[in-house]
Amino acid sequence: RDSSTSRGLGDVYKRQLTHRGRIETFAHLGLTCFALELMPRISRAQSMDILSSQSNLAGYKAVIEAVCKLPSAVPMMMTAAGTIAPAKALILGAGVAGLQAIATAKRLGAVVFASDVRPQVKEQVESLGGRFVEVKSDENFETAGGYARETSAEYKQKQQEAVAEQLAKTNFAVTTALIPGLPAPRLITKAMLSAMPAGAVVVDMASSAGGNVEGSEDGKIIVINGVTVIGNSNLAASLPASASPLFAKNILNFLDTMYNKEEKSLNYNFEDELIKGTCLCYNGKMIHPSFTGA
């Protein structure tokens, strides 16, 4: 099937070793394969950005999952019997998932705090009603593509101190921090969990990549030092009626850039950064830098 084309969300960064043999098999079969999670972060690619469309839903669902496990109400309630204070939320990572988590928690009535290694996102956090937990540093931890990069040991120490201080006052937290090609950064330790209020909940969206929370397990809900820790890195799958149409539209928009209406076939222009950035194998060879080391 030399003319066959495969597309999908293969998670090449996270599972390169696991998937390498599979991609080699695809190449030997003459398949042309694309990994859409490698889509360049440029304006022309926004309608094809699977990571963004799915992460947006995941950020929303993470807050819903956390709130459902809380033993208390989220918004402030003033009644004749007394006043219920609003819940405090902490969102770690202000990418697409994190920003949606901030917006969702705010709409539910929580007092929302957020932290990110990229100080540039402070304005976005505040525009959604969140309060930015800033860690002062002269270092730049943002890649050219807008993703977070690995931080220095000094910064990690400062960040951990700031997060620990805020966590001690937090009723529920959502962690979304991922670094392409590397294990998820450890943001919350078991000691930090033990300092959280009774009944606190943490959702670790990076659990399949090693986890932002010490002790979290992907696909499991466990209690660590009195805190309910939900490990779930595939929350969008729990919203199939919303996730599937967006996923399908992303793929359709991507295929549309390659489709030649006159010839009624797909033409691969490897000068196009969308094609070059996402194609794993072509013409019997593995060509993406993730595999070739180029």
Identify the function of each model-found stretch:
Residues R1, E142-A173, A177-S194, N232, ...:
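A structured beta-alpha segment of the ubiquitous adenosine-cofactor-binding alpha/beta core
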Residues D2-Y13:
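Single conserved hydrophobic/aromatic residue that forms the stacking wall/gate
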Residues G8, K169, P197-A198:
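Alpha-helix C-terminal capping/helix-to-coil transition sites in glycosyltransferase folds
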Residues L17-S43, A184-N234:
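Rossmann-fold NAD(P)-binding glycine/threonine-rich loop
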Residues I23, V63, A101-I102, K122, ...:
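Generic hydrophobic/aromatic pocket-lining and core-packing "Φ" positions
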Residues E37-A80, S207, V213-A294:
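Adenosine-phosphate binding glycine-rich loop
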Residues P75-Q166:
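Glycine-rich phosphate/diphosphate-binding loop of Rossmann-like nucleotide-binding domains
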